[in-house]
């Protein structure tokens, strides 16, 4: 099982120390309610070899390597273990010559977001709904002091720990398997990311307030979410599914989203990027057995979802507390 005690020790002397009042008990409770496959997935992490990387690049990729390459047999054993943790959704990872080609080219999103951010050097960062942690490692690559990701999905936790093991057990990033609604208001993070989460929330304004409660005064929110065209009063509430996703509740226009953020008290709210999701950014690979974007779009008109809505378009909004 994954040991969270090193993280407790890390935060004990930081401005996250108040979290220790609740977090250890929450994670003990979490361990009693884990997915039936969690024990198997965590063992896969244990089975991965302890390799030392001579070269690690988190600035332009998430990559580890060493001067003496792995044998083909060693590579195949690692691939076998990593593929037992499929589906790999967010990446890519380049680990000792192994290309983990995930469904999403999350580096595309990072390249769109990064130029607009307050410098991450020396910052304490929270990544909400972090998945397997790809963007967390890129934040570390930008010089973040500490990155904490939260995501309740046990598979993502095990994927993250597998990658960490192949990055010389780097402790600058940590994934905690909780949702933001389970976090006490810490007001301790310099930057809070919420990317690809808001439209899954039944109460989007509550989510925005929860994000605000984790920021220091003056801290920066980085919000990335689905949007639709329209004015300040435009919000799509899909009747049943959106792009085959049942758990999509509210997709606002950019103007409506800015209004929401201002309504819960954020300042300096601005949209810095809008991009339609392409078939190059989200696609099927050998590391994903499920459907992907091509299956969610109208086969005769890729500008629409299979349900007839506009195809996925995502905005990046920055704001300050």
UniProtKB/Swiss-Prot annotation:
Q: Where are the transmembrane segments?
A: none
Which of the seven top EC classes does this enzyme belong to?
transferase
Mention one GO biological process in which this protein takes part, according to its record: tRNA wobble uridine modification
Q: Does the keyword Nucleotide-binding apply?
A: no
**Which EC number(s) does the record attach to this protein?**
2.5.1.-
UniProt KW Magnesium keyword? no
Alphabetical keyword list: Transferase, tRNA processing
Q: What are the recorded GO MF terms, alphabetically?
A: methyltransferase activity; transferase activity, transferring alkyl or aryl (other than methyl) groups
Q: Which Pfam families match?
A: Methyltransf_9
Coiled-coil ranges per the record? none
Per UniProt, where does carboxy-S-adenosyl-L-methionine bind?
A: 90, 104, 109, 129, 151-153, 180-181, 195, 199, 314
- For this protein, what reaction is catalysed? carboxy-S-adenosyl-L-methionine + 5-hydroxyuridine(34) in tRNA = 5-carboxymethoxyuridine(34) in tRNA + S-adenosyl-L-homocysteine + H(+)
Q: What does this protein do?
A: Catalyzes carboxymethyl transfer from carboxy-S-adenosyl-L-methionine (Cx-SAM) to 5-hydroxyuridine (ho5U) to form 5-carboxymethoxyuridine (cmo5U) at position 34 in tRNAs.
The record's similarity note reads: Belongs to the class I-like SAM-binding methyltransferase superfamily. CmoB family.
Task: Relate the assembly described in the record.
Answer: Homotetramer.
Which PANTHER family does this UniProt record tie to the protein? Answer: METHYLTRANSFERASE, TRNA U34 CARBOXYMETHYLTRANSFERASE
What's the protein name? tRNA U34 carboxymethyltransferase
Q: Which gene encodes it?
A: cmoB
């Amino acid at each position: 099982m994954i040991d969270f005690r090193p993280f407790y020790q890390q935060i004990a002397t930081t401005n996250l120390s108040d979290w220790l009042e609740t977090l250890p008990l929450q994670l003990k409770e979490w361990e009693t309610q884990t997915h039936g496959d969690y024990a198997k997935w965590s063992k896969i992490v244990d089975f991965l070899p302890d390799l030392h990387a001579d070269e690690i690049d988190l600035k332009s990729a998430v990559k580890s390597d060493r001067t003496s390459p792995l044998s083909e047999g060693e590579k195949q054993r690692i691939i076998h273990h990593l593929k037992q943790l499929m589906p790999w959704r967010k990446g890519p990872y380049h680990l000792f010559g192994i290309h983990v080609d995930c469904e999403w080219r999350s580096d595309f999103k990072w390249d769109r977001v990064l130029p607009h951010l307050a410098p991450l050097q020396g910052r304490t960062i929270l990544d909400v709904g972090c998945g397997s942690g790809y963007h967390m490692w890129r934040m570390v690559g930008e010089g973040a002091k500490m990155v904490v990701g939260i995501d309740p999905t046990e598979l993502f936790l095990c994927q993250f720990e597998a990658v960490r093991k192949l990055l010389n057990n780097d402790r600058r990033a940590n994934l905690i398997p909780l949702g933001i609604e389970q976090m006490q208001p810490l007001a301790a993070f310099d930057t809070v990311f919420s990317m690809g989460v808001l439209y899954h929330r039944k109460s989007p304004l509550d989510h925005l307030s929860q994000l605000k409660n984790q920021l220091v005064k003056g801290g920066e929110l980085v919000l990335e979410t689905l949007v639709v065209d329209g004015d300040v009063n435009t919000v799509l509430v899909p009747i049943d599914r959106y792009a085959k996703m049942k758990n999509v509740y509210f997709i606002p226009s950019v103007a409506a989203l800015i209004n929401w953020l201002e309504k819960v008290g954020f300042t300096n709210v601005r949209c810095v990027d809008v991009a339609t999701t392409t078939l190059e950014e989200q696609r099927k690979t050998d590391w994903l057995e499920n459907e992907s974007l091509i299956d969610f779009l109208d086969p005769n008109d890729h500008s629409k979802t299979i349900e007839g809505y506009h195809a996925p378009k995502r905005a990046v909004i920055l704001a300050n507390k």
